């Protein structure tokens, strides 16, 4: 180990500066040896304490507080630690260094690396044990085999899971092949197993014997192979270093890169099997060369020519025929070669002189010297394949590729066929390359590896595969047509494009239908349209896109949509822009009968557009749109697959696909492109690049100082059609740069490695890296259409008129007619909001500041600069064109000075155009008539309330999405201001590495009023409490949640006694709680302090998401309420009672929502004042909407329903227009666990069931159905899903139903209890149900399976009554705490006579003695007079609907009796 230390002197104290420049660098695979080397080195210098933390940091200052002075021990410690920090960091490879970027001391680096690579997790240990089981000798040498095993033994020991010696020996022996059986038998015969060193030595000796035998039987027959010459000479290379057998082999400087042992000889055990091959000497089939009669003659002739000189067993050998020279530019595949060999020095991209004394031996026994060694790469259509340790032999006649080294170094497999071969990815099986044979040899199809060009130079040559990828994977005929007609530079014109695996995977199709007979004579005469729905929601919440295809030119426009209802607005915009541009009108519009197109009928008739539709269920009649869908989707998916980009980026890929499709020739236009047909000029292909490849935009203007990097690796996502630039996504900072100064690496695809290596911490940083400015203008309505303007001075003029160019008198531009979504159709900038007080998010250049690069030489460098290339901006809105387009004078002055920096679009992942669907804004009436709409008088029509889809614009999922909308920005600003005002945290430097730093994220919610109208936008900053560790980051947890029964009881009492009910909301309730633990949190996404970006938040107050936050808030609230006289209920800890004389106040707490009621308005008002003074409380006054429950008070009582929740659920499940049914569950057939076909994806089923469970608050009529379907959540079937949809259909007909708390109620407590004996045919467990009434008010109900199988219906009913009595006993305790006294004992009605008698006396004890004793407590209550059990007829048993599905008549009868009804009229 070449490491030394220099001694520095500071204040007469030595400080060691350790130089570790030659120490083996840490990678992801050698931590074990690296840590031993580094720790031993520092231990030798007595500095190991700085690594393991035993040498602690002294205090920074000493002396008194009044006169502190710097501690010299601290200065020495800090300087020594920094030197060690630098030395250790220098011994870490670049790929690992980001993992320790947050460490500030050497001990933190050491601990971080230990946690990553030596953490004894179950997965890590299991992985190592699995590798040991799979580690077989195979073709490995004994040295390699033993080294792999011992390394894993040591790693397990490092993780604290060592294997004992016997187990290690067993692992070594069991994975050896059959030829080592003698050694295995010898070791097994010993009483005590030998050491691993002894086993290794015996295996080496046996390996030498096997090599000697195999070398004696191998005949030097001419073959195209490079192998290791094997003789009877014993391999002595291992003797010299046998004591260091388990050292790191990377440090063995004496070994050469190609010094490896030969493939093991496997004897043929089946001697009776005839030899079917052809003799290599005489050419006769049926015997091998070893048994040929001409063998002796052949050997003598070979020996007479030139006797071979002695050589070592590891000497490289080339068994090739020295015939006519073969072109040195061609590579030949050789399955027997162990090393790559080349005679062309240009084939080595990285090389070094060879200083060894070994030569390559050829078939005639002569040797050829080795001049250099190096490496290169061979390109394929998906990724380059690397060739390492190539031997450069000038005098050899062929370039040989070792199949073994090719497969092992690149993770591929090679399949040989009689006339061709294929190279496939080993993991996915996807073909990477296909080649053919030539002169009976397997020749690599590419002559040599091509250097990767990082420049966007039109003169750079590319292969057919590269052009195929650049042009979006077109058909081979189209590809050849483009290359031929436009004279594109191709690296090897004679080599024709064969196939593309990405195309084969994504472009499978059916037989086409017949062609349409419609003929068009001009653009826009026929427009075909259709909507496509994506199964995957994009990052910007796009679910659909709509296309418009011009029949005459086949030109396509694409707009992404969030809702299908946006089609009408989109088409109107599309029609106005195109008709104004081309000075012609749309004649006929062809589509299917979708509702989004039906909504356009009136508009079509008003504007004279003929609307043709396809017959029902016949999409083939809209074949042009359907085929265009297939073309777009296949091309887009192929682009994503080729670049390994997640499918959530489909709008970008589809936009680029349409951009390329419009520029590719099509046979329908006689190999003319739609672009050329529409604009009369040829497209420009020079600036096309491979979608998703690595790119390097010029980013100098964004550097903070002159030493920053001028560029960063980004991902190419498309073409900006409003600027002369490309779209470049930087993955680490999640910024989308728009730049014209870009260099490309078209063989590298960053996404393929980025997502796999993204850690949770990096994901948090990625979300937090968003920068935002309140002055940044964002588009408010942006379809995916390009829109440059002809008048824009940044773009070239319109193309010269051409005889074949239609509309040549119209200055037509093209860019906006493409479907690159980047910033198409940007609307006018939103007015800048005034800056609020308080902290603001980190800023970004505004739109004016972030104009794209200089417009100099746009005709040369614009990727979309095809003469008519400015239609995109000319088709943009007038406000945008006038505001954002600079004047010619300004443009000239700006471009003549210095280029402006590239624009930044803020979004991780890249943003699509923001669509703001404001359903609350009606069109402005310009006529003079006075209307209700002008006066703001709007009365909704109730008969249409159920036909309106309430799935409005969805809430954003990330801070990046929310920052695009001013309303969400304001909500986020309010939340941050509240946190700052409450002094929730302090910004501090990061704590030590062993302290958990909790992440945080934003939660966005729309708050609605009881009528469904929008109340406000709410943004909540929550901590990622799931990262907290119990006992370290928190101790106890509790959430103040009032029981639903308590709510119904208190509301029933308040309604009956005409008390006011007030609703409160505590602002930032969890912030009121004080933390007793030290909790550190990362800075909020979008609001990172630009001066201290690496600091973290040390929480002083609780925050939503923390494990201890609910309990901290509850303790704070409870302590205060107790000080002002409230008493905390024992029955329900979230209920508080204040009583002063005859005045009483009840308070119900559900986290931060509070209900308060009482009989004394003065006391109630004083209580509200006290709460407002202590907490930030929002008083909603009278109860109207609480926890998603709509409360409507009428003179006769209070109606509770969940109408809004039901409608949202129906809209989310697309069931709002479903045909209603009268019962939630059919009585037959009965559902079973195994009925129907199992769902492949149960996610939807489970989500709907979970949503329905919340409806039980006001809907006892669906309790049984929901409970029954909940029992199948672990394995739902299609039949269960249909039953679930039946509940939704029932709710669609009864969304306004709920429970009615009637005024003038008698406060008597009674309940109905029932059981369905053995009703479940899967396990024969009974179902019990009950419903409890306080007077006429239903206050509690349940439908639940019993715990076990019962022997009779009486036992089932008896258990049900016992459970009901438990609930009633709790209710009685709660009523007592509320000050309510019952005038008579509670009553339970049961329809089973035996169970009724059993509750009163033990007459059936002999038949019921197996019942658990705890069920018999009901007898004590009955005998003491605290409870009565009364028999009731089955016809009057109201709990019957809670235990089984009923017929329509019976269900409707019971539903009305149990209290589920519509809201009574006022």
Curated annotation (Swiss-Prot):
Q: Which UniProt keywords apply?
A: Aspartyl protease, DNA integration, DNA recombination, Endonuclease, Hydrolase, Magnesium, Metal-binding, Nuclease, Protease, Transferase, Zinc, Zinc-finger
This protein's species is Arabidopsis thaliana
Q: Which reaction(s) are listed as its catalytic activity? A: DNA(n) + a 2'-deoxyribonucleoside 5'-triphosphate = DNA(n+1) + diphosphate
Q: Where is the composition biased (Pro residues)?
A: 899-912
What's the protein name?
Retrovirus-related Pol polyprotein from transposon RE1
Q: Where is the active site?
A: 334
Source organism, top-level taxon: Eukaryota
Zinc fingers, CCHC-type class: 278-294
Q: Where is the composition biased (Polar residues)?
A: 255-270, 915-927
**GO function terms (MF aspect):** aspartic-type endopeptidase activity; endonuclease activity; nucleic acid binding; RNA-directed DNA polymerase activity; zinc ion binding
Q: What is its EC number?
A: 3.4.23.-, 2.7.7.49
Q: Where is this region: Disordered?
A: 227-270, 772-927
